[in-house]
Design a protein with these regions (language model features):
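A structure-centric signal for secondary-structure junctions around beta-strands
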Residues: 37, 86-88, 151
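Generic protein-terminus/edge-of-domain signal
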Residues: 1-67, 72-75
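Alpha-helix N-cap/helix-initiation sites
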Residues: 59, 110, 150-151
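Amphipathic alpha-helical segments within well-ordered protein domains
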Residues: 138-142
């Protein structure tokens, strides 16, 4: 890890599968960081904010949805030129073992999700159409009191996102520190 990059200790303990933070804030203040677990981060009402994922630097529009599955991929959302005073952010942190050969994620029902998760090692940004498809689920997941149903909702979100072919890889392969493997 490079100097100045925070290694975040997430709120998940060894028996937790996921953690959801749904917050409204006036500005982005959290520093550039990375963490051991996967993250799906949704931001709305933050046009002009700067998103940095690895070596990708972009100014976002009103909606942003990014999936990061690499523990070494640093990322941050910065205030930059965002004028909004009511930024809405939903962060879903979760753990899945994609490396295990017998993982259910490698079976046919999960194939599209697995492939998307592998691409997300570089960070994936989703189109507005994909975001709008899962928007109601993103809004509902944080209020889900039953853990099982929240996990079910997360898998539904991931599956719906995996059906969109237009997700944009954010970081370059050299910067993302990812071993490129092929199953062909």
């Amino acid at each position: 890890m490079y100097p100045g990059i925070l290694h975040e200790i997430t709120p998940l303990n060894e028996h937790d599968f996921m953690y959801v933070a749904d917050r409204h804030k006036e500005e982005f203040t959290y520093p550039i960081h990375c963490h051991e677990i996967m993250e799906l981060n949704f931001v709305e009402n933050a046009a002009g904010c700067r998103r940095i994922v690895g070596d990708s630097i972009e100014v976002i529009g009103d909606y942003d949805l990014v999936l990061i599955t690499s523990s070494d991929l640093e990322h941050v959302w910065e205030q930059h030129e965002c004028k909004s005073r009511d930024i809405h952010e939903v962060t879903i942190q979760f753990r899945l073992n994609l490396e295990e050969k017998n993982s259910p994620m490698r079976t046919n029902p999960f194939r599209s999700v697995y492939e998307m998760m592998m691409r997300a090692r570089y960070g994936l940004s989703f189109s507005r159409q994909a975001i709008m498809k899962v928007y109601p689920r993103l809004m509902a997941i944080s209020s889900q009191q039953e853990g099982f149903y929240a996990v079910q909702e997360l898998f539904s979100i991931l599956y719906e996102l995996s059906k969109f072919d237009d997700a944009c890889q954010l970081s370059s392969s050299s910067f993302a520190k990812v071993n490129v493997e092929s199953e062909s």
